Amino acid sequence: MEKVRLLSIGKSGGAGEVFTVEDQPRYVAKIYHASIRESQRAQYARKIRWMIDNKPELPAIPTEYQGIVQLAWPVALVMKQASFAGFVMEKIDFGRTMELDYLLTRRQAADEGFDVDFGKLVTVCHNLACLIDCLHSKRIAVVDLKPINLKVYKSELYVSILDCDGFHIYSDSFVSEAPQVTPEYLAPEFHEKAVTQPEAQDRFALATIIFRLLNYGIHPFAGIAANRIPYPTELSGRIKLGLYPYGKLPSANVRATPASVHECFPDSIRELLDRSFTSGTGARASAYEWAAVLSSFASKSSADMSRCQKGHLQFAGKSCPCCLREGILRGHVERQKRFMVRLQASPARAVTYVKKTLKGTQTSPFQAALAQVQLNSVQLAPVTMSIRNVASIEILWTIGLIITFWWLK
């Protein structure tokens, strides 16, 4: 057993703290908090030992791509005075990576120096699907699969998964406890229940992440009520009721968000999405299926991707999603301008417009909240509004326009 010196880097989570390993730049150590009860620590020790002995075979990486770590996987135990304290894992270079969450909005990606196009997004989706498939082949599931726990190498587009000691293992030789879950990525059959089918849960979360990556961050269960049925305000409630508005067959109860570009997706991708969100646990697309379908679009020499007249990458035979999105943004700006003209010309008619807006035509929570404020302020004012009130309303709507433009961008 080798003695090492650990140096704190000031990063601590719910279960433990991360340290660098002196003279070992490729590795870091996670030390569990001393406050963890002994029974829980013993469970961690059994799990980490199993993981060290059963590392999954990961997707091959070209030899020219040095230093890419796809899993922060345990490689050795850390013992303190003959007692289990934590584990050593390979270090992910945070300087070369960014949170996958940043790819859900182009502005955040640009702030990270990453120029987003649909070729890169599809490649990230493909690499993530391959990685999840490797885990499932070893009967390991992430369960709490979500963008914030994923890193993307900016140049190579490979994906890394953090917090591997939180994975759920369901092999014949060892079964671990199911981890905590995030409601926005939780399959409908597991709401208010334990996750009894971890791979099915991963399949749902994987499809959700892929949909969001390809659709400018829009969640697959974000939509607009199409009738007067009770419509949950929380995404988890919509997931539980199966209110998915982006299928090839339209839903009678909910409409797609106007900012969505899902109709620009190829049929093969839309079919996997529909199966993942509408067909139940048994028919949900596997990580292997996703990897197979996405592989042709991720290839640089693929004829399944083409360029539009403006030079944007698009799916061959489909409309350009970037051009469609630009049109949506321009249309939104024009509608805001027309509303300001209407407001100044006839405040009473503008109130009617805002009331109608609040009943289901809003495309974002920012607009809805702003419209409610706007409605209250207009109702309290006389029909002939003072210059001060008009100026206040203009300021409010200008702020709303900026916020909404940022959200759509």
Indicate where each model-derived feature is located.
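Conserved C-lobe activation region of Hanks-type protein kinase-like domains
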Residues: 201, 210-266
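Terminal C-lobe "cap" of eukaryotic-type protein kinase domains
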Residues: 276-302
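Catalytic-loop of the protein kinase fold
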Residues: 132-154
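Conserved structural core of kinase catalytic domains
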Residues: 69-120
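ATP-binding glycine-rich phosphate-binding loop
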Residues: 1-41, 66-69
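Conserved end of the kinase activation segment
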Residues: 189-200
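Activation segment/activation loop of eukaryotic-type protein kinase catalytic domains
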Residues: 146-184, 188
